[in-house]
Amino acid sequence: IETPNGKTVELSDEAGAIRIEDEHGNKILLDSSGVTIESASDLNLKSGKDAKVTAGANLDLEAAAQLAVSASASLEVSASGTTTIKGALVQIN
């Protein structure tokens, strides 16, 4: 299905995939490898209450420039194994 403005929804039994794409280059792909969400610009996830990300094995967060983590109340970082903090300069408090 494709609209005149370039929005596409593709259901493929042959490829076993569902692909949704808009004219701005934003894409959602569901296939046997998983779910891929791709944004040509910003990607925002917003929840009116709690949000949770759970991975069965590893979870990687990577930013080309800066990564900021903040909380208005408390923040906890914990691991049952070794915790490593690396940086050219590490400042605590």
Can you say where each PLM-predicted feature lies in the sequence?
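Right-handed beta-helix
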Residues: 1-93
